[in-house]
């Protein structure tokens, strides 16, 4: 199984930062993605960064990289996670109240939703109310916790794929947690546990 970790955006993407500029999403995504790949490799998994560059590689190119791997190994032998930080409307450069962790798949039920369930299970164990944290679930869905959206990186790739929104870069409490050593490791650990448990339980 090839595990591809995508780090959203790039150094040249406008905006995408906390209002005080301390957190820049492209950098944070890359730090989390690199730590996750490192820990996956330490556990013996075949994991790679999808975008080693600092620049914002176009989504068409990102999807092509994933699908090339799917064509080589088979789409059932590739797994994709796209790492992002969330932001609340309006895009006014200010702090907002929305908080929490969430994950997205495409519309309808696919293997990506099965994968997302394992990520949510891991998130609910770590991002607890006792820590002052929250996990955002799609409450209108009867069987699924993840949100659904037609994000290009999910819609145009052939393998199971989930996009995670790792808290809000425009919420002061979330940013404080995200930038803490404990917060960083928690976010990496949730992805690591979710990936491992999915791979251990997936139907062959």
Where are each of the predicted segments found?
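Soluble non-cytosolic domains of exported or imported proteins
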Residues: 23-31, 56-60, 109-114, 178-189
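Mature extracellular/periplasmic domains of secretome proteins
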Residues: 59-76, 151-156
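Active-site-adjacent mobile loop/cap segments within catalytic or ligand-binding domains
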Residues: 3-6, 17, 23, 82, ...
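Extracytoplasmic/secreted envelope proteins and their assembly/folding machinery
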Residues: 33, 37, 60-63, 100, ...
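Active-site-adjacent substrate-binding region
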Residues: 112-145
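Loop/turn elements at helix/coil->beta-strand transitions in domains of secreted/extracellular proteins
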Residues: 1, 43-48, 73-80, 158-162
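Active-site histidine-acidic residue metal-binding/catalytic motifs
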Residues: 1-65, 89, 97-99, 128
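Sec-exported extracytoplasmic/periplasmic mature domains
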Residues: 34-45, 67-71, 120-128, 183, ...
């Amino acid at each position: 199984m090839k595990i591809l970790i995508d780090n959203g955006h790039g150094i040249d993407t406008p905006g995408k930062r906390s209002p005080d500029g301390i957190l820049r999403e492209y950098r944070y995504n890359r730090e989390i993605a690199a730590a996750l790949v490192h820990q996956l490799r330490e556990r013996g998994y075949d994991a790679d960064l999808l975008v080693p560059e600092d620049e914002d590689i176009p989504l068409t190119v990102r999807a092509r990289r994933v699908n090339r791997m799917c064509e080589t190994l088979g789409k059932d032998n590739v797994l994709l996670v796209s790492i992002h930080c969330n932001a609340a409307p309006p895009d006014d450069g200010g702090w907002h109240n929305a908080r929490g962790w969430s994950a997205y798949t495409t519309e309808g039920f696919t293997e990506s939703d099965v994968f997302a369930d394992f990520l949510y299970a891991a998130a609910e164990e770590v991002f607890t109310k006792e820590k002052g944290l929250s996990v955002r679930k799609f409450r209108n869905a009867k069987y699924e916790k993840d949100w659904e959206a037609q994000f290009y990186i999910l819609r145009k790739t052939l393998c199971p794929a989930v996009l995670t929104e790792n808290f809000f870069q425009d919420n002061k409490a979330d940013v404080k947690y995200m930038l803490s050593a404990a917060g960083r490791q928690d976010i990496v650990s949730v992805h690591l546990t979710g990936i491992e448990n999915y791979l251990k339980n997936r139907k062959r």
